[in-house]
Amino acid sequence: MTGTIRTRLGDGSLVEMTTAEIRADLEAGTEIGARRSKAPQLTTAELDHLQDIFTSEARFSAVDMGDEVVLSFDGSGNLDSGTRVDELYSYQCHRGADMLELFGMDYSYKAVKTILSFEAQTMKTAQLNLIAPLQYGAMPDLGRYSMPDGPIPNWSELMPLNRIDEARDAQVAAIEHAVADMVYCAEGMWEAGADGMDFDTAGAAGDGDFLAALTAIEKIKGRHPDCGIELGMASEYVLGMHGQLEYKGRRLAGMWPAEQVKVAQEAGATMFGPAVNVNTTKSVAWNVARACTIIKPAMAVAEIPVHPNVGMGVGGVPMSPYPPADAVSRVSRALVDILRCDGL
């Protein structure tokens, strides 16, 4: 192949690259992913396979027959038309979803708590109309518990003032509120017939946010062992907003997916969703090579199903309101073929 290939950047824009340029991006992506996460680089054979995927001139790409994986969704059904139940039905019957999620538009358990009775009734109605497993999902969203929206002093304001101990204490106090709200919502949804719970974008506010999710999962599984629980991450790396928080002896700050999945399964999660954010100025090939490199070590230690996040802006999927299908299909195939993941 001597000409140029039409491919995508991380923002979804169409660009033309040569085979040599795509190969160089693949090698650069795995190199920086390995260097940052201290993981092995992808093998030559894996890079060759990715090159085949991204240099193909086909409009779509797909896994081989027999290699299909489960498609789970966080936030399926967003009132584009009709009711949320209508949207869930559309995801099940028209989009091929294997697992569905009911959610509130605020997507925060702090907000859901105030409308739990309404959400529980919607869950019950949805369960009567659907066949696919249906979970309820939202974010731990630890930041909402800080002032002015919450009762806790704002640690983001305290830290620049060098009031570090106060900032850490504030995060610990916020964790207690967040855990209570997540457990409360889970109890209501379980009674309404939910098949599971999703704690999505965990770690968005740092290690305290991640600890809140893990603690809530442990409490819920202790009460309801049959409840499915998905833990989806906010990023490939847990930020140390507190810096000293631990879960069962493991420091959370600085964790990459291989360590994240260990604490997730120890807490009782039944599915783990690693997230690797995209660089919008780099090619999709570069982003996919980096994502595969960062997630691959987690596959070797995971004892629960792993579903890499492939929403807009994560996992290699372009950051665009409507990610182009040619890019999404290549990203999906690459993650399944290289990682041998359980789903997406």
Segments and roles (model prediction):
Residues 2-304, 320-344:
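Alpha/beta enzyme core
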Residues 306-320:
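Active-site pocket-lining segment
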